[in-house]
Amino acid sequence: MNNVVIRTEFLCKSFGKLDVLKDISTEFYQGEVVAILGPSGSGKSTFLRCINLLEQPTKGKIYFHEQEITNPKVNIAKVRQQLVMVFQHFNLFPHMNVLQNVTYAPIKVKGINKQKAEQHGLELLESVGLEEKADVYPSKLSGGQKQRVAIARALAMEPEMILFDEPTSALDPEMVKDVLEVMKALALSGMTMAIVTHEMGFAKEVANRIMFLDQGSLAEDATPGEFFQNPKCDRAKQFLEKML
């Protein structure tokens, strides 16, 4: 059990009378790359947001290692330092340059020395191919560059797991490849990742596992080979016919 990073037990989320997540029980293992697929409105993003408690589950439990993080007494801010999220729309600070965006949280939240944080920040920007943009402000960057900065910012916290919420869906098609290449390199480095995505080729190539959500339920949990070649449920078959 000790290499399980996240475990969910009978996770439910409702908005009023709408049941968005229904009894999702699953585990994410260290070093695993899980692609979360499904039609629009199936609960994928809500599930991801529940994992680091940006959304409070209506019922059920979430464990980070053996700690129940749905317990109200848990310091959620501390947990989120280890479970960082990369959003669809980047969410960079517009009044800070690229390097300041990357180093802000390590300095303010973790108390890391500014010089050390900046050195690490420049290394991370180099790893995403943007070291020459360190002094540039977000308004001068393309969407793909902004998303790569957002990934560097997430990595600056040295997290245990990164949650990606449709990281390429707001990008122009020609920008998608650069972001996916960075994510692929991250996967190869052993980073634990959960990725809500519509990029089927990427999911097939990079993920170790596919979770397919439909109407808030975990309809299928399989290897990419099993899911793409021989999906079990009819809804997954219909989904793949449209997407591939």
Could you tell me what each predicted segment is?
Residues 3-224:
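ABC family nucleotide-binding domain
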